């Protein structure tokens, strides 16, 4: 019985491989090939560098989508060019193959589910299940019906020059821009001369971009060159800015003008939901300019390792676009000498929705903590709270824990080792820390049954990390 089930796929597999061995492979042959043989044979042709077979198989591809990214991880530009040559024949010839369905060339770095499903199907003979397990194609609705082919790509601009596959693709797209639509949903800029970035951005439909990450040591004059492109990304949902610096050669007047040019672009971003800003020095004294230009309710706001004025915090607490936040991260912002009333007001506004709160390394001291406790204890949706790196005493920590007792959704809490845990030289006194943790464990167990509480030390001068310990005195990580 098992033989009768496995024999048909084995015969199909042998027949398919004989097709690949045929040097005079014709389109008529492929048009009679069973659909289920295309994915495994395409993979084999790609791995064996059968360029002519690839070219013809692309033209006869019986699916709407060709997810090529997992295959081009194999370092062979020749096979990639063969696929593009096959697409050329589809785009430029008036007469197309009878079974032609290809509409999407997908070069996004997504899961390899398509190829895995069909490979397993070839081995097991369960082609019907393979068809059922295929994920639906995500189209680009802004270009539906305008061009016969859409090319999905993710752009990671991390070197001075592009890799050879992306260079080949962009050159090919540039020469055929009227015949296809290049759709980029994710753009990462990690390091590349801006003149090269500019030439790439001119080729991309900017309103397709949904996520942008810029992690470069850009000074403000370079940011001004990027600013006009940002304003055209009208479907942008997530923006990450990191390591933006103010050149010492920029005057205060120039800085204000540049910041104004940049922040006014946010008036056009009606889909923005997640905003991440790390080590962005131009925010100091100018956060109100950015906040006043936000036109949507943010779900995520992280402003980390930045210098902010007390007035910036006040503007943040008054911003109408933060009332539905689920994630708030202000770690690394020094608040030691500030009133925390603005933070209290901010927490009151987001109490109904906030799920993640990070106030690590803010330098918050004992006298400041009481200001935020009433608002914090009303954040009933909170599931993660991190407060490490703030030099508070044992008494203040106990008070903090007593206010988070009613937050039933808390799954993870991270607190600093109290000041009493350290010696006069600033190093952790292990015996004292063990005793303090035992006292805290008893106090917490009397109040509630926490899911997970960790206590973090100061940063280690050797490894640069902090160690975490749970209530049972076991080391968590370093």
From Swiss-Prot:
Q: Cross-referenced InterPro entries, in alphabetical order?
A: LRR_dom_sf, PRAME, PRAME_domain
Which Gene Ontology terms of cellular component type are present?
Cul2-RING ubiquitin ligase complex; cytoplasm
Q: Return the protein name.
A: PRAME family member 25
Question: Quick check: keyword Repeat in the entry?
Answer: yes
Which parts form a coiled-coil structure per UniProt? none
- Highest taxon of source: Eukaryota
* Organism for this UniProt entry: Homo sapiens (Human)
Task: Extract the Gene3D superfamilies matched here.
Answer: Ribonuclease Inhibitor
């Amino acid at each position: 019985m098992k033989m009768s089930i496995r024999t048909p796929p084995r015969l199909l597999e042998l027949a398919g491989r004989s097709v690949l061995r045929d040097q005079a492979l014709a389109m008529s042959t492929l048009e009679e090939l069973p659909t289920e043989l295309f994915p495994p044979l395409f993979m084999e042709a790609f791995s064996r560098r059968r360029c002519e077979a690839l070219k013809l198989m692309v033209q006869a591809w019986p699916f709407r989508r060709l997810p090529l990214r997992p295959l081009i991880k194999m370092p062979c530009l020749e096979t990639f060019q063969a696929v593009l040559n096959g697409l050329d024949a589809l785009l430029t010839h008036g007469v197309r193959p009878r079974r032609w369905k290809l509409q999407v060339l997908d070069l996004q770095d997504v899961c390899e589910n398509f190829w895995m499903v069909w490979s397993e199907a070839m081995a097991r003979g369960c082609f019907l299940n393979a068809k059922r397990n295929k994920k639906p194609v995500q189209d680009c609705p802004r270009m539906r019906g305008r061009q016969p082919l859409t090319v999905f790509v993710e752009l990671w601009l991390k070197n001075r020059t592009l890799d050879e596959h992306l260079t080949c693709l962009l050159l090919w797209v540039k020469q055929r821009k009227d015949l296809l639509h290049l759709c980029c949903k994710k753009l990462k800029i990690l390091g590349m001369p801006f003149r090269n970035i500019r030439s790439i951005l001119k080729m991309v439909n900017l309103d397709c971009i949904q996520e942008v990450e810029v992690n470069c040591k850009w000074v403000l004059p370079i940011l001004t060159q990027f600013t006009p492109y940002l304003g055209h990304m009208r479907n942008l949902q997530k923006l990450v800015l990191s390591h933006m610096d103010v050149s010492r050669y920029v005057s205060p007047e120039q800085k204000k003008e540049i910041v104004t040019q940049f922040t006014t672009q946010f008036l056009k971003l009606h889909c923005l939901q997640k905003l991440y800003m790390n080590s962005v020095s131009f925010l100091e004294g100018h956060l109100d300019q950015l906040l006043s230009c936000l036109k949507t309710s943010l779900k995520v706001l992280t402003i980390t390792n930045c210098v902010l004025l007390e007035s910036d915090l006040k503007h943040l607490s008054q911003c109408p676009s933060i009332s539905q936040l689920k994630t708030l991260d202000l770690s690394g912002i020094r608040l030691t000498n500030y009133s925390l009333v603005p933070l209290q007001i901010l927490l009151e506004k987001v109490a109904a929705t906030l799920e993640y709160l990070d106030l690590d390394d803010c330098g918050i001291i004992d006298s400041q903590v009481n200001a935020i406790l009433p608002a914090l204890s009303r954040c009933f949706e909170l599931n993660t709270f991190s407060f490490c790196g703030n030099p508070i005493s044992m008494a203040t920590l106990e008070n903090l824990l007593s206010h988070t007792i009613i937050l039933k959704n808390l799954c993870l809490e991270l607190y600093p080792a109290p000041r009493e845990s350290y010696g006069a030289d600033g190093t952790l006194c292990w015996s004292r820390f063990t005793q303090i943790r035992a006292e805290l464990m008893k106090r917490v167990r009397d109040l509630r049954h926490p899911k997970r509480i960790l206590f973090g030390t100061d940063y280690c001068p050797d490894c640069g990390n902090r160690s975490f310990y749970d209530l049972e005195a076991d080391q968590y990580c370093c």
